[in-house]
Amino acid sequence: MKRKLIYIFSCWLSSIILFVACDDMEDKPFTSGIIGDPTETGTAELYVLCEGLFNQNNSSLARFSFGNQQMVRDYFKAVNRRGLGDTANDMAIYGSKIYVIVNISSTVEVIDFRTGSSLKQIQMLAENGSSRQPRYIAFHKEKAYVCSYDGTVARIDTTSLSIEAITSVGRNPDGICVQNEKLYISNSGGLDYSSGLGVDNTVSCLLYTSPSPRDRQKS
């Protein structure tokens, strides 16, 4: 079971530290009114993403406020009155939003970091309705890019929160980053390794110019 932590200094996001841990968290006494309280936006906060158990639909997002020393273990559920989904795999902040990649549920949960409220649950589904199984997210110039195990990268507009374009890459991509106006996607081939194809030891490079990514390369 994996947890990802994001440490935020104030609403201006002047510093962010991400790390992974597997230590248990103890529940703290809940104080009414702290959830989504906009008066806390000037304090430091810690967000903890727990992917939960595979196929158990028990992913969670916890929040710790350093200002009042309060922990809400399942912060997302407390605010939105529903669970986060099955196997939350990645979390990142861009602008005023938290983006959570929920792998088995095949969704991208977009959350207002000031209030914890869900702004949109983006369904990552293929045309035939099958799950794309999103894995990781990166950002560039008001766009979010999500790589999925079905061998695709989706471009999401961070204002409308709609999927604008989908591009094919290698087998089971399992990492994505931005550098020098390019997207780099590591392809794993991990899901069909036993079929005799072996690993996919390639990196896809996408040159993204308006209106959509193009010129896919492998190396």
Question: What kind of region is each of these model predictions?
Answer:
Residues 67, 113-116, 157-161, 207:
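Short loop/turn segments that connect beta-strands within beta-propeller blades
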Residues 44-56, 100-104, 146-150, 185-197:
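Conserved beta-strand positions in repeat-built beta-propeller and related beta-rich domains
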Residues 2-5, 15-46:
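Bacterial Sec-dependent N-terminal signal peptides
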Residues 63-132:
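Post-signal peptide N-terminal segment of secreted/secretory-pathway proteins
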Residues 208-217:
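Conserved small/polar residues in nucleotide/adenosyl-binding loops
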Residues 83-94, 127-139, 170-180, 186-188, ...:
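Beta-rich, blade/repeat-based domains predominating
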Residues 60-62, 107-109, 152-154, 201-204:
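A short loop-to-beta-strand structural motif that recurs across blades of beta-propeller domains
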Residues 43-44, 96, 142, 181:
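Short coil/turn segments that connect the beta-strands within blades of beta-propeller domains
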